[in-house]
Curated annotation (Swiss-Prot):
GO terms for molecular function: deoxyribonuclease IV (phage-T4-induced) activity; DNA binding; DNA-(apurinic or apyrimidinic site) endonuclease activity; phosphoric diester hydrolase activity; zinc ion binding. One of its GO terms (biological process) is base-excision repair. Zn(2+) 2 binds at residues 144, 178, 213, 258. This is Probable endonuclease 4. It comes from the Bacteria. Endonuclease IV plays a role in DNA repair. It cleaves phosphodiester bonds at apurinic or apyrimidinic (AP) sites, generating a 3'-hydroxyl group and a 5'-terminal sugar phosphate. It catalyses: Endonucleolytic cleavage to 5'-phosphooligonucleotide end-products. The lineage of its organism: Bacteria, Bacillati, Bacillota, Bacilli, Bacillales. The gene is nfo. Keywords: DNA damage, DNA repair, Endonuclease, Hydrolase, Metal-binding, Nuclease, Zinc.
Length: 296
């Protein structure tokens, strides 16, 4: 199964270290930020250790890796021109890094309209993406399905479709389908996932989905909260998520876990990914997973 998680990329090893971390977690793919998601500090492309990273990926059988754009990008902002301009400029540079790393998709939160209304936010996102998607490369921007927290744009399939329809080079737009976000937005991810896919296909088209974020949710359906939970421990539940990751629609799509680290002590939190992947690959839920992780 083409499944992995968000892994770190830092120090001198950079991409090579990401591949090694993913391998230790028994992953077949992984997702990275090119730097801290909260700021714009980035290393030069030549310092990302890409060649050694690719060699490690080949050795460990890792493929279809994904980049995630930082949270600070908000091209839906109609109130502050400098925030919009920073977002456009930084997204262009992130696409260059994504191409150099060899990833096909960079996941982007569409943005927040900060009070101007979703229609105004969508117009601004379209403006920004039309500025960004002019340089000639193969990198796709994967718009993420959002939970609808605050003034987030992208809480419905229709909002995402509006963005896609307004962008000139929309062959370079894809979708990152997030199970937690879509559940929190009010879609029946737990109880009737095939109808959700059917609706998505009618509004956007299943061929647009190029990344799957696999997360349980701490919240009831429609809560608009966006709080991830470990696989099988939330309101979506193991059976539904297991069904989703084994669904034929996602067979060749990278499936990325973004579930929380385990442990009460903030200084001793541990990644759950190896165990969550094992549960999904064996299709068997282990209610003692968290205790097992902390006892290792």
């Amino acid at each position: 199964m083409l499944i992995g998680s968000h892994v770190s990329m830092n120090g001198k090893k950079m991409l090579q270290g990401s591949a090694e971390e993913a391998h230790r977690l028994n992953e077949k793919t992984f997702m990275i930020y090119t730097g801290a998601p909260q700021n714009t500090r980035r290393k030069a492309i030549e310092d990302l250790n890409i060649e050694a990273g690719h060699e490690a990926m080949k050795e460990y059988g890792l493929s279809n890796i994904v980049v995630h754009a930082p949270y600070i990008i908000n091209i839906a902002n109609t109130q502050k021109p400098h925030v919009f301009e920073l977002g456009v400029d930084f997204l262009q540079k992130e696409i260059e890094r994504t191409e150099a790393i060899g990833a096909k998709d960079i996941v982007l939160h569409p943005g927040s309209h900060v009070g101007a209304g979703s229609e105004a936010g969508i117009k601004k996102i379209i403006e920004g993406l039309n500025e960004v998607l002019t340089n000639d490369n193969d990198v796709r921007i994967a718009l993420e399905t959002m939970a609808g927290k605050g003034s987030e744009v992208g809480r419905t399939f229709e909002e995402l479709a509006q963005i896609i329809e307004g962008v000139n080079h929309n062959e370079r737009l894809s979708i990152c389908f997030d199970t937690c976000h879509t559940h929190d937005a009010g879609y029946k991810v737990k109880d009737d996932f095939d109808s959700v896919l059917e609706e998505f296909d009618n509004v956007i088209g299943l061929d647009r989905i190029k990344v799957l974020h696999v997360n349980d949710s701490k919240n009831e359906i429609g809560a608009h909260k966006d709080r991830h939970e470990n696989i099988g421990f939330g309101h979506i539940g193991f059976d539904a998520l297991n069904y989703i990751v084994h669904h034929e629609v996602f067979e060749n799509i990278p499936k990325i876990l973004e579930t929380p680290f385990v442990g009460e002590d903030k200084k001793n939190k541990r990644p759950p990914y190896k165990h969550e992947i094992e549960m999904l690959e064996t299709e068997t839920f282990n209610p003692n997973m968290k205790e097992i992780i902390m006892s290792e």
